[in-house]
């Protein structure tokens, strides 16, 4: 699409069964700069990522998705990325959508682009829907910004955006914290619809729907508590 240097960041925890294929699919779309952050995995995620040709950074302990993503963003800053894309490492995000996310940035129409599952095709597990609704509400209450999919991990950032924001929260609440910083920095944000790939592997995570709905609610409550704690500390 352009001469822009694009890096793909994959925070990963125990994704050894699928990470190599995920990296392969990303590279098949022409994006060869892939960084995997192995967040203290106990399986072969690290080895599989290296064998697939990804730049691989390992956390010695599991620090959380937020910490892993921030490590990846730090790395792309140092490597001089023009555009950085974050994706989930379990194969749910379609690499064909990367172009859709980076295009507004390359054309100077946005600083941050969110891939929204709510604007795309339906079929999201109910636990994820609940977590997303809670996340949207919490993001608006704490940071005054409303988007359709505040908890989406499929995002693209311009160099300007990465130079303007930095998250401190280690787990899933960092998604909301990042949006708050985007607003504070007065960066241009855009949402685009994405197609989520629900494979047998990914759906296995939600096979007991009631249990995962309860877990989604619990995670939402934990997120609120951590955001309150972070606000009080500041």
What are these regions (language model features)?
Residues 38-46, 91:
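A conserved acidic beta->alpha catalytic loop
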Residues 13-28:
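Short, well-formed alpha-helical segments that are part of the catalytic scaffolds
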Residues 17-21, 43-52:
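Acidic helix N-cap motif at the loop->helix transition within catalytic regions
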Residues 5-7, 177:
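Cell-envelope/extracellular polymer assembly enzymes that use nucleotide-activated donors
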Residues 61-63, 67-78, 95-172, 199-224:
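Acceptor/aglycone-binding surface of glycosyltransferases and processive sugar-polymer synthases
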Residues 81-90:
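Short beta-strand-to-loop acidic/aromatic patch adjacent to the donor-nucleotide binding site
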Residues 7-11, 35, 58:
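Short hydrophobic beta-strand elements that form part
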Residues 146, 169-170, 180-197:
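Catalytic donor-sugar/metal-binding loop of nucleotide-sugar-dependent glycosyltransferases
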């Amino acid at each position: 699409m352009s001469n822009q240097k694009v890096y793909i960041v994959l925070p990963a925890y125990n994704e050894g069964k699928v990470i190599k294929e995920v990296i392969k699919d990303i590279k098949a779309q022409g994006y060869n700069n892939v960084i995997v952050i192995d967040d203290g995995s106990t399986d072969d995620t690290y080895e599989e990522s290296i064998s697939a040709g990804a730049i691989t950074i390992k956390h010695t302990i599991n620090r959380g998705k937020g910490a892993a993503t921030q490590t990846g963003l730090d790395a792309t800053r140092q490597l001089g990325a023009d555009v950085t894309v974050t994706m989930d490492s379990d194969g749910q995000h379609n690499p064909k959508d990367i172009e859709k996310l980076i295009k507004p940035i390359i054309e100077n129409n946005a600083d941050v682009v969110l891939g929204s599952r709510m604007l795309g095709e339906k079929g999201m597990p109910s636990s994820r829907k609940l977590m997303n609704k809670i996340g949207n509400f919490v993001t608006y209450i704490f940071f005054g910004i409303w988007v359709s999919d505040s908890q989406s991990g499929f995002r693209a950032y311009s160099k300007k955006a990465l130079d303007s924001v930095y998250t401190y929260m280690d787990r899933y609440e960092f998604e909301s914290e990042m949006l708050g910083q985007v607003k504070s920095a007065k960066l241009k944000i855009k949402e685009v619809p994405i197609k989520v790939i629900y494979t047998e592997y990914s759906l296995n995570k939600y096979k007991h729907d009631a249990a995962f709905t309860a877990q989604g609610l619990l995670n939402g409550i934990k997120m609120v508590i951590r955001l309150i704690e972070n606000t009080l500390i500041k």
